[in-house]
C-alpha cells in the first residue's frame, strides 16, 4: 500500500537519507523567502498565492531528490536528498513563522474556508520547529531508519552469499512457500534484520517528533496525525466501526485456522489459540489472499486467482499499468501523462541498484510529473496494487490545479480508497472475463462463495491490522507504551485484534513493529483502516450511479461515465473542503459507515457462520498464551521441499524403480542362500551395491523433503522411511567393507562344522540341532555345544568390532545416536524400552516357576554334580543350542507321563507326511479362514527341504517377498516333526502377510512393526498345536480334555513360549549396549553371560574367555537381524489369539481355542495385515484387539492353569525361585580355584585372571543382596498374582519359533 506523496509531513517529504555527518545549514534563496503582507484576510490571500508558487519549486526539488535516492540508494544521492530536505524545512520554518507572526490571532475568523485551511497548514511547522542541530539529527534518523529497512537482507544459514531482500524474494517466499520452517526462517530473519537495528533510532525519533509537534500546539505526534480527520470523536468512531466488523473477522479467522490445521497439524495450529503469524501468506499477516489455495471453499470451481493466466498470456508490468489506465479512462477520467510513462519505475531494476521497493505514488508538484515506483510482479494481487497506486495518480491529476496546501485527499483514507474502489470492479469474475483472464463467468452460489472468500482474505483479514498499527504508535507517542515495552505491547495488540502470535520467542531486544515499512518510514497507517471502510461506501454509491442492480459484490463500474463523473467531483475537491461534506456529496452520508462492507460480504458471512457451527469452531482464541514449538532441525532444514505434488511424483518414481531393484536383489540373495558359492557370493555383493546405490540416490532425494510439512500421511510415511539410507549412507569404501563383513560373517556361520576326532563332521542343521534335541548324554551335549561356539563364534569375533563401528557410523549418518537407536525407531514408540521392561517384569514370575521346575527335573536326570538346585542351569542341557526353547526336553519334564502322548512326530512319519504336506496343511489353515492361498510360484520355487545334491545352503528358516506381487517363497530345511510343522505355519504367516499387503507401495510392504510380522503365523500355530486340531489332522488319537492332559499340553507350550521370553529380551539388550559403547569388545563375552545369567538363569557349562564370542554362535548376530521383534511377537501373538478366538465365538479356556475355519477371525486378521506399514502399529493392534497397547495379560491368562500347578509343585518340593547361588558352574563343582598351570581362575563360567575375579566377586556380592530383595518382593508378587487370578477370566496363547525375516 503506497503512501500518497502529496501531503506535507515527515513521511512524505523526508524519506530515506543515509546516516551522514550533519550538513551545514543552507541559505534559502531570497526569491523563496516570504515578503511583506498585511495582517488581514486580503493580505492572507496574497500570502497564500505567494507561498503556493514558492512551495511548488521547493517541493519539486525535495521530491525529485527523494525519487533519485529511492530509485538508486547511494551516498551521493543521500547527500543531495538531505540538502533538499534541509532546504524544505528551512522554507517551512520561514513561511510558517511568518504565518504565525501575521495571522495567529485572526486566521480562524477568515471568511474564506479554503484560506483558513491553507493558513492552518502553513503555520504547522512540524520538524521545522526544531533547532538546526536537532533538525539535522531528525533527518538523519529518518534516513537511517529508511535505509535499514530498504537494504535489510536475510541470508541462508552459513551461506552469506545467498541473501534475500524483502521484495521480491522474501515476499515470494511468504506468498508461495508452504514449508513451515522456510516461512519461519524468512519471517524471523526479516523481523530480526529490519527490526532490531531500528529500535534505538525509533526511540530518538519519537522524542524529537513529539518535541516538534508540541510546538504546533499538539499534545504529541499522534494528536497531530489524528487532526487530519477533523473529528473530536475520531477514536471512538473507529472503535465503533471495528466492533461492527469484528464478528466477520472472527468467523474468517476460525475458518482459516481450521484450514491451516489441516495443512500443518496439531503441532503448529491450536484450534483454540492464535495463528502463528508467518503462515498467512504475508510478512505481516495483513492480507491472506496468498493462501487462498489452502482455504478455497469449493476447489472444483474455476480458479479465481488468474496469476497463471497472466503469465501464460505474457503479461508484463507495463501491460498491467496500461490495463489500469484503461479502466480510469473508460470512466472518462484522465489518462496518464507522458511524464508518467517516461519517469516511473514499474519494475525492480536489473542493474543491481539498491532501491526502495515498497510501492508508492509520487506527485512532483509541477502539475505534470506524476510517477509510480513499484517492483511489480506479474500476479493478480499486484494487479490490484497497480490499480491502488494509479488511484493515487488519478487523485493527483484531478486536484493538480488546487493550491499546494490543498493537494491531498479529503482525508488520508480518501487517497488510499480511490484505486481500491476500481480494484473492487477489476477483481470481479465478470471483469476478469472482459479483459481475457477468465474463460467464462459462473455466478452460481459456490462460485460466489469462492470469490467472496478470496476478497475477504484481502479486505476482512486486513481490518484488525489496519486498526492496530496506529493504536500502537499513538501509545508510543503518548508515552503509554514506553520503550521498555515496545515489543510486548505490539504483540499484545496483534494477539488482541488479529488473533495471531509470534512463531518464535520475542522479547524487548526485538522491534517487530519496525519490520513494517510504515513504521520506520513514518507513514501514518490508520488511513488504510479508514480507506477499507470508505471504499465500500464509494463502491455502493458508484454502482448505484452506474445503474447497477444486483449483489454488490458482482458490480463492475467499468465504462460507466456517470460513475466516473461522480468520482471526479470527489477527486477534484482535494482537501479543499471538510471530508464529511465531500463524503455526503458522494454517498449521501457524512460519516464512515460499515454497512456497505457488511452488505458486500453478507453471503460469505452467513456461509462462514454455518461452516464454523458445523465444525464446532471456537470463535476467538481463548488459549491466547499458546505459542507453537520450533520445528525440528531448525534453521538448517529450511530449504526442504514441502510441495505435495512433487512429493507424490517422487514417491511414484521411487516405488516403480524399487520393485525392479528389490526383485533383482531378492533373486541374487535367494541364489546365494540356496547355493553358497564364490560366484553367487560375488553376484550378491554386486546386487548389494546396486541396491545401496538405489537407496542412496532416492534416500538423498527424499531428504530434500520436509516430511513434517507434508499432509498426505501415506506419502509422508513413505518419504520418512526412504530418508533412512541405512547402510547406504556410508561412503562407498566403507559400504563395500560393511557388505563384505556381513557376507563373511554370514558365510562363516552357515558353513561352520564341528568334527569328531575320527574326521566325521556335523553341520548345525540338521546334525548338531538333532544332537542338542535328542541326546541325553551330558558329555555329548557339551561336545556339540562347545564345538559349535568354537567354530562359529570364535571365527566371527574378528569381524564384529569393525561391523559395530560401521553400523554405528551408518546410523549416525541417518540421524540416530547409534545402531540401537535406529533399530528401536522401527517401533515408533518413544517409551519402547520402558514398555518392554514392564512386560518382562509381568512375565518373570511365570518364567521363574518354569525354570525351578525344569531345574528339578534336570537334577533328577543328571544329578547334583551337574545341576545345583539353587543355581543357574548349564546352558547345554535344555534341548536347544541356545537354550531359547526347551520343548525338546519335554520327555524329561512331562508332568504326567502316563497321560496320552502329544508328540505327533511318530504319527506324521507313519502316515508318510512330507515337508510339502506340512506346508499344504498350513496353506489349508489360512484358506479356511477366508485368507489367500499361496500362488503357484510358491510351490514351484520354494526350498522346503535341505538339498541332497551337496549344495551348501543357509538352513535357517526364512520367508521371502520378491516384490513383483506374485513370487513369494520359503527356504527351510524342514524335518518331519511337530516342531517344524509349527515353524511351517510361522513361515506361512509371513507369506500371508506379504500377499495381503502386496498392492501397497514397496516402502510400506512390511509389518505394522517387526513383531507383527513374526506373530501372524504363530497365531495360527497356537490353534494348530491344540490337541483338538492335531486330532482333526489324525495325528492324535483323541482330543484329550483331562486336567492332566491340559497341564501336559500347557507345559509343552510353556517350554516353547515362556522359556523363550528372557532370551528374546536379552539378545538386543546386549547388542544395544554394544552399539552405545557401554559394552566394549574386551567384554563382549563376559557381558553376554552376565545377561544370560541375569535373565535366563543359565551358565556356560565350561569356562569362557575373552577369546570366545558366544553371541556370534547365534544366527541373528552375524546376520545383523534385530531380535527384540521376537520378544514383541511372543507377547502380541497371545493378544491376537485372544481377540481372534472372541471373533470366532470361542468360549472356554484360551489354550483350547482353535480358530480353524472361522471367516470372522480371518477377516479381522486380513484387515490388519492389509495395512502393512502404512499406519502406526497401534492402529493395526486396534483393528485386531480393539485396543492399541501391548499387554502380557493374554499370555498370563493362557498359562494361568499351568502357573497355578507349577506354583503348587514348586512349593511342594521347596524349590528356590531364581538362582541365589548365581556364581555356581558345573566346572566349579569339580574344581574351585586356579586352573592347572594357568595362574587363572574359573569365575562365573569365565576363565579370568585373579584380579578380574576379585572385582567380579565384589560385584556379585552386590548382585546377591539385590537378588535377595528381589526374591522377597517376588514372593509377595506371586501371592498377589494368585489372588488376582482368581478373579480374572482366561485370555489366550501364542506359539512362535523365531526365524529370520528376509523380506527387507
Swiss-Prot record:
UniProt KW keywords: Calmodulin-binding, Carboxypeptidase, Cell membrane, Cytoplasm, Disulfide bond, Glycoprotein, Hydrolase, Membrane, Metal-binding, Metalloprotease, Phosphoprotein, Protease, Repeat, Secreted, Signal, Transmembrane, Transmembrane helix, Zinc
Record-annotated disulphide pairs: 155-163, 357-375, 543-555, 755-761, 955-973, 1141-1153
Matching Pfam families: Peptidase_M2
Active site residues according to the UniProt entry: 389 (proton acceptor 1), 518 (proton donor 1), 987 (proton acceptor 2), 1116 (proton donor 2)
Domain Peptidase M2: 38-622, 641-1220
PTM entry text: Phosphorylated by CK2 on Ser-1297; which allows membrane retention. Phosphorylated on tyrosine residues on its extracellular part, promoting cleavage by secretase enzymes and formation of the soluble form (Angiotensin-converting enzyme, soluble form).
Extracellular topological intervals: 28-1257
GO CC aspect terms: cytoplasm; extracellular region; extracellular space; plasma membrane
Enzyme superclass (EC): hydrolase
PANTHER family referenced in this protein's UniProt entry, alphabetically: ANGIOTENSIN-CONVERTING ENZYME
Name of the protein described by the UniProt record: Angiotensin-converting enzyme
Species whose genome carries this gene: Pan troglodytes
Amino acid at each position: 500500500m503506497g503512501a500518497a506523496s502529496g501531503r506535507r509531513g515527515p513521511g512524505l517529504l523526508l524519506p530515506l537519507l543515509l546516516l551522514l555527518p550533519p550538513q551545514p545549514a543552507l541559505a534559502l534563496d531570497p526569491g523563496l523567502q516570504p515578503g511583506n503582507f498585511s495582517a488581514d484576510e486580503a493580505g492572507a490571500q496574497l500570502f497564500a498565492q505567494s507561498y503556493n508558487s514558492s512551495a511548488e519549486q521547493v517541493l519539486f526539488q525535495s521530491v525529485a531528490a527523494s525519487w533519485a535516492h529511492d530509485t538508486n540508494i547511494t551516498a551521493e544521492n543521500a547527500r543531495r536528498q538531505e540538502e533538499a530536505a534541509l532546504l524544505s524545512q528551512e522554507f517551512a520554518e520561514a513561511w510558517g513563522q511568518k504565518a504565525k507572526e501575521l495571522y495567529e490571532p485572526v486566521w480562524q475568523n477568515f471568511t474564506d474556508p479554503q484560506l483558513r485551511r491553507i493558513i492552518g497548514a502553513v503555520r504547522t511547522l512540524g520538524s521545522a520547529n526544531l533547532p538546526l542541530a536537532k533538525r539535522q539529527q531528525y533527518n538523519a534518523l529518518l534516513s537511517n531508519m529508511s535505509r535499514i529497512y530498504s537494504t535489510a537482507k536475510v541470508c541462508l544459514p552459513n551461506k552469506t552469499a545467498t541473501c534475500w531482500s524483502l521484495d521480491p524474494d522474501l515476499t515470494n517466499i511468504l506468498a508461495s512457500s508452504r514449508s513451515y520452517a522456510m516461512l519461519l526462517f524468512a519471517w524471523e530473519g526479516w523481523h530480526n534484520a529490519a527490526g532490531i537495528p531500528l529500535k534505538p533510532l525509533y526511540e530518538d525519533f519519537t522524542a524529537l517528533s513529539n518535541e516538534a509537534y508540541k510546538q504546533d500546539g499538539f499534545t504529541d505526534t499522534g494528536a497531530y496525525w489524528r487532526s487530519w480527520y477533523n473529528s473530536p470523536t475520531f477514536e471512538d468512531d473507529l472503535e465503533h466501526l471495528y466492533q461492527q466488523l469484528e464478528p466477520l473477522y472472527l468467523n474468517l479467522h476460525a475458518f482459516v485456522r481450521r484450514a491451516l490445521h489441516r495443512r500443518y497439524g496439531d503441532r503448529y495450529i491450536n484450534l483454540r489459540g492464535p495463528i502463528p503469524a508467518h503462515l498467512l501468506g504475508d510478512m505481516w499477516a495483513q492480507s491472506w489472499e496468498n493462501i487462498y489455495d489452502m482455504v478455497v471453499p469449493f476447489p472444483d470451481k474455476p480458479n479465481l486467482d488468474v496469476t497463471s493466466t497472466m503469465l501464460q498470456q505474457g503479461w508484463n508490468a507495463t501491460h498491467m499499468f496500461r490495463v489500469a489506465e484503461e479502466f480510469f479512462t473508460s470512466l472518462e477520467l484522465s489518462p496518464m501523462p507522458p511524464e508518467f510513462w517516461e519517469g516511473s519505475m514499474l519494475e525492480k531494476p536489473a542493474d543491481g541498484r539498491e532501491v526502495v521497493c515498497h510501492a508508492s505514488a509520487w506527485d512532483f508538484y509541477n502539475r505534470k510529473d506524476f510517477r509510480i515506483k513499484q517492483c511489480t510482479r506479474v500476479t493478480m494481487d499486484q494487479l490490484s496494487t497497480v490499480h491502488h497506486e494509479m488511484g493515487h495518480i488519478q487523485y493527483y491529476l484531478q486536484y493538480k490545479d488546487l493550491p499546494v496546501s490543498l493537494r491531498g485527499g479529503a482525508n488520508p483514507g480518501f487517497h488510499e480508497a480511490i484505486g481500491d474502489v476500481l480494484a473492487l470492479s477489476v477483481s470481479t469474475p465478470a471483469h476478469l472475463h472482459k479483459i481475457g483472464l477468465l474463460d467464462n463467468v459462473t455466478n452460481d452460489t459456490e462460485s460466489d462463495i469462492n470469490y467472496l472468500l478470496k476478497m475477504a482474505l484481502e479486505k476482512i483479514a486486513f481490518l484488525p491490522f489496519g486498526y492496530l498499527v496506529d493504536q500502537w504508535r499513538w501509545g508510543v507517542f503518548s508515552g503509554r507504551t514506553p520503550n521498555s515495552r515496545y515489543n510486548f505491547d505490539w504483540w499484545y495488540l496483534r494477539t488482541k485484534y488479529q488473533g495471531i502470535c509470534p512463531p518464535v520467542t520475542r522479547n524487548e531486544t526485538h522491534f517487530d513493529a519496525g519490520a513494517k515499512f510504515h513504521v520506520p518510514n513514518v507513514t501514518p497507517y490508520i488511513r488504510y483502516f479508514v480507506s477499507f471502510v470508505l471504499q465500500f461506501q464509494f463502491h455502493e454509491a458508484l454502482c448505484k450511479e452506474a445503474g447497477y442492480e444486483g449483489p454488490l459484490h458482482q458490480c463492475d463500474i467499468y465504462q460507466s461515465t456517470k460513475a466516473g463523473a461522480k468520482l471526479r467531483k470527489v477527486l477534484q475537491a482535494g482537501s479543499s473542503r471538510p471530508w464529511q461534506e465531500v463524503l455526503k456529496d458522494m454517498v449521501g452520508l457524512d460519516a464512515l459507515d460499515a454497512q456497505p462492507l457488511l452488505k458486500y460480504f453478507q453471503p460469505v458471512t452467513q456461509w462462514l457462520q454455518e461452516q464454523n457451527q458445523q465444525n464446532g469452531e471456537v470463535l476467538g482464541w481463548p488459549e491466547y498464551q499458546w505459542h507453537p514449538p520450533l520445528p525440528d532441525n531448525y534453521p538448517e532444514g529450511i530449504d526442504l521441499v514441502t510441495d505435495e505434488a512433487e512429493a507424490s511424483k517422487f514417491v511414484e518414481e521411487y516405488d516403480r524403480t524399487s520393485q525392479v531393484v528389490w526383485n533383482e536383489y531378492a533373486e541374487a540373495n535367494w541364489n546365494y542362500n540356496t547355493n553358497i558359492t564364490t560366484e553367487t557370493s560375488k553376484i550378491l555383493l554386486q546386487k548389494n551395491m546396486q541396491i545401496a546405490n538405489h537407496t542412496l540416490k532416492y534416500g538423498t532425494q527424499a531428504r530434500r523433503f520436509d516430511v513434517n510439512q507434508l499432509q498426505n500421511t501415506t506419502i509422508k510415511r513413505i518419504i520418512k522411511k526412504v530418508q533412512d539410507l541405512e547402510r547406504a549412507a556410508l561412503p562407498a569404501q566403507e559400504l563395500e567393507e560393511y557388505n563384505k563383513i556381513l557376507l563373511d560373517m554370514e558365510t562363516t556361520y552357515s558353513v561352520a562344522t564341528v568334527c569328531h576326532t575320527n574326521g566325521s563332521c556335523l553341520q548345525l542343521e540338521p546334525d548338531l540341532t538333532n544332537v542338542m534335541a535328542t541326546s541325553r548324554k551330558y558329555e555329548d551335549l557339551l561336545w556339540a555345544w562347545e564345538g559349535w561356539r568354537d567354530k562359529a563364534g570364535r571365527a566371527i569375533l574378528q569381524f564384529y568390532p569393525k561391523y559395530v563401528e560401521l553400523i554405528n557410523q551408518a546410523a549416525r549418518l541417518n540421524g540416530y545416536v547409534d545402531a540401537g537407536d535406529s533399530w528401536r525407531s522401527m517401533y515408533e514408540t518413544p517409551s519402547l524400552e520402558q514398555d518392554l521392561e514392564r512386560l518382562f517384569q509381568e512375565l518373570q514370575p511365570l518364567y521363574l516357576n518354569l525354570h525351578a521346575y525344569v531345574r528339578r527335573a534336570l537334577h533328577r536326570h543328571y544329578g547334583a554334580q551337574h545341576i545345583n538346585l539353587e543355581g543357574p542351569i548349564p546352558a547345554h542341557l535344555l534341548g536347544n543350542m541356545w537354550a531359547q526353547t526347551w520343548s525338546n526336553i519335554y520327555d524329561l519334564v512331562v508332568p504326567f507321563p502316563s497321560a496320552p502322548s502329544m508328540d505327533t512326530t511318530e504319527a506324521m512319519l507313519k502316515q508318510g507326511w512330507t515337508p510339502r504336506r506340512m506346508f499344504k496343511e498350513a496353506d489349508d489353515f489360512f484358506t479356511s479362514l477366508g485368507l489367500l492361498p499361496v500362488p503357484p510360484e510358491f510351490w514351484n520355487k520354494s526350498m522346503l527341504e535341505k538339498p541332497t545334491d551337496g549344495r551348501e545352503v543357509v538352513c535357517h528358516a526364512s520367508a521371502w517377498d520378491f516384490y513383483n506381487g506374485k513370487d513369494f517363497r520359503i527356504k527351510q530345511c524342514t524335518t518331519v516333526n511337530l516342531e517344524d510343522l509349527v515353524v511351517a505355519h510361522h513361515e506361512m504367516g509371513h507369506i500371508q502377510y506379504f500377499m495381503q499387503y502386496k498392492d501397497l507401495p514397496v516402502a510400506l510392504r512390511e509389518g505394522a512393526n517387526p513383531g507383527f510380522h513374526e506373530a501372524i503365523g504363530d497365531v495360527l500355530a497356537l490353534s494348530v498345536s491344540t490337541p483338538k486340531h492335531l486330532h482333526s489332522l489324525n495325528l492324535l488319537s483323541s482330543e484329550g480334555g483331562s486336567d492332566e492332559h491340559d497341564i501336559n499340553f500347557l507345559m509343552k507350550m510353556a517350554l516353547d513360549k515362556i522359556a523363550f521370553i528372557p532370551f528374546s529380551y536379552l539378545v538386543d539388550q546386549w547388542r544395544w549396549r554394544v552399539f552405545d559403547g557401554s559394552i566394549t569388545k574386551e567384554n563382549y563375552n563376559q557381558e553376554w553371560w552376565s545377561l544370560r545369567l541375569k535373565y535366563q538363569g543359565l551358565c556356560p557349562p565350561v569356562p569362557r574367555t575373552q577369546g570366545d564370542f558366544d553371541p556370534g554362535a547365534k544366527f541373528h548376530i552375524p546376520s545383523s537381524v534385530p531380535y527384540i521383534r521376537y520378544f514383541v511377537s511372543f507377547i502380541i501373538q497371545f493378544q491376537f489369539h485372544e481377540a481372534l478366538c472372541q471373533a470366532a465365538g470361542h468360549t472356554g479356556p484360551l489354550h483350547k481355542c482353535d480358530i480353524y475355519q472361522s471367516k470372522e477371525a480371518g477377516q479381522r486378521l486380513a484387515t490388519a495385515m492389509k495395512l502393512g506399514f502404512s499406519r502406526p502399529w497401534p492402529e493395526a493392534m486396534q483393528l485386531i484387539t480393539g485396543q492399541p497397547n501391548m499387554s502380557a495379560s493374554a499370555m498370563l491368562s493362557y498359562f494361568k492353569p499351568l502357573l497355578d500347578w507349577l506354583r503348587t509343585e514348586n512349593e511342594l518340593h521347596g524349590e528356590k525361585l531364581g538362582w541365589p547361588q548365581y556364581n555356581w558352574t558345573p566346572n566349579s563343582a569339580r574344581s574351585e580355584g586356579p586352573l592347572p598351570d594357568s595362574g587363572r581362575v574359573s569365575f562365573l563360567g569365565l576363565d579370568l585372571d585373579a584380579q578380574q575375579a576379585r572385582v567380579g566377586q565384589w560385584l556379585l556380592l552386590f548382585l546377591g543382596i539385590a537378588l535377595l530383595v528381589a526374591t522377597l518382593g517376588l514372593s509377595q508378587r506371586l501371592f498377589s498374582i494368585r489372588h488376582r487370578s482368581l478373579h480374572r477370566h482366561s485370555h489366550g496363547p501364542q506359539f512362535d519359533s523365531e526365524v529370520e525375516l528376509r523380506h527387507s
